[in-house]
A protein has these predicted regions:
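Short, Lys/Arg-enriched N-terminal segment that forms or immediately precedes the first helix
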Residues: 8-21
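Short, leucine-enriched amphipathic alpha-helices that occur as contiguous helical runs
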Residues: 10, 27-28
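Pre-recognition alpha-helix immediately N-terminal to the DNA-recognition helix
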Residues: 29-34
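A short acidic, leucine-rich amphipathic alpha-helix
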Residues: 46-52
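Basic amphipathic alpha-helical segments that dock to polyanions
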Residues: 63-73
């Protein structure tokens, strides 16, 4: 019998944490599972609500600290979208995003855009870039067909 997918993911997460000298706490395992189960870009508040029933003692600072650890380990990506709350992406692989100015939805784009030009411009300005993300802004197809304009 095959192990449930979330169990396999938890084993892999625990191995990654241990390999980096970190403990695989129940909070870390649950937060990672919640982000994967939401299957979308989520805020720390949304993750706190998604885990509240199973871990009522979990606090928002712990959620943020855990997400930052996951980002450091390459397990999630922070998505820079406007001035709203930070969104966390369960897909750490390189990809771009589209953010709707009308409904706020953020979706993955599968186009492969090279960040080399932006990185070179940052270096030319004296900065030391270590990564780049592209977020395309506009009105999503659902809002556009409903007549939304921004």
């Amino acid at each position: 019998m095959k192990a449930p997918a979330h169990r396999t993911t938890e084993v892999a997460l625990a191995a990654t944490l241990h390999a980096r000298g970190r403990r695989a706490t129940s909070q870390r395992l649950l937060l990672h599972r919640a982000l994967l189960e939401l299957d979308r870009h989520a805020t720390a508040d949304e993750l706190l609500r998604a885990t509240a029933e199973r871990l009522p003692q979990l606090s928002l600072p712990t959620v943020y600290a855990t997400l930052e650890l996951f980002e450091e380990l390459g397990l999630v990506r922070r998505v820079p979208v406007g001035s709203g709350p930070v969104l966390w992406d369960p897909r750490p692989d390189p990809h771009q995003h589209f953010a709707c100015r009308s409904c706020g939805r953020v979706v993955d784009l599968e186009a492969r855009v090279r960040a080399g030009t932006a990185m070179a411009a940052a270096r030319a300005a004296g900065h030391a870039p270590d990564g780049a993300q592209l977020v395309v802004m506009g009105v999503c197809s659902d809002c556009a067909s409903a007549g939304a304009h921004v």
